[in-house]
């Protein structure tokens, strides 16, 4: 059985104004991942995601590339203990 965990990621590059958060939400819902994504004042996007480990790996791989019009320069990740979220929200 795949364990459940959470991760916090910070994504920098051209990641605001390119539908990054909305695209992340769509994929997260497909992968049954909960959490949230928000823009930061410094131009980065912060993502907090919880789900099965294999699904989080797939999601993280996508975060490193982003949607079509994005350019990801750096994507950092911190694994965190499981938290029970119901949905994935764009903040």
From Swiss-Prot:
GO terms for molecular function: acylphosphatase activity. The keyword Phosphoprotein does not apply. PROSITE patterns: ACYLPHOSPHATASE_1, ACYLPHOSPHATASE_2, ACYLPHOSPHATASE_3. The active site is at 21, 39. Pfam families: Acylphosphatase. It is an enzyme of class 3 (hydrolase). This is Acylphosphatase. Its EC number is 3.6.1.7. PANTHER family: ACYLPHOSPHATASE. Residues 6-91 form the Acylphosphatase-like domain. Belongs to the acylphosphatase family. It catalyses: an acyl phosphate + H2O = a carboxylate + phosphate + H(+). Keywords: Hydrolase. It comes from the Bacteria. NCBIfam families: PRK14451.1. It comes from Legionella pneumophila subsp. pneumophila (strain Philadelphia 1 / ATCC 33152 / DSM 7513).
